[in-house]
């Protein structure tokens, strides 16, 4: 693989980030909007940063950070539904995608060859 842009998990997490930003456009709570969009942006950003470090151990570390951000994002999506800041159907779709991305990240971590 020549570039992080070729990773399916990066592509999907980037699309999810865009979806989260769109879902939060009308959000009246600026603090919530800022926190959830930061979590969403953290996923593809950490995948890219880890890949560009050119070190297996660094890549794994950043993939784990991205995986943690998936959990943070899912939590914020659930809370956004419950407090009425996010449309349930849109947020549920994002929750499902974040869970799949988390699984993909773990699979990638498990498949990376040793140094």
Task: Enumerate the language-model features and the residues they cover.
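Amphipathic alpha-helical assembly/interaction segments
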Residues: 1-115
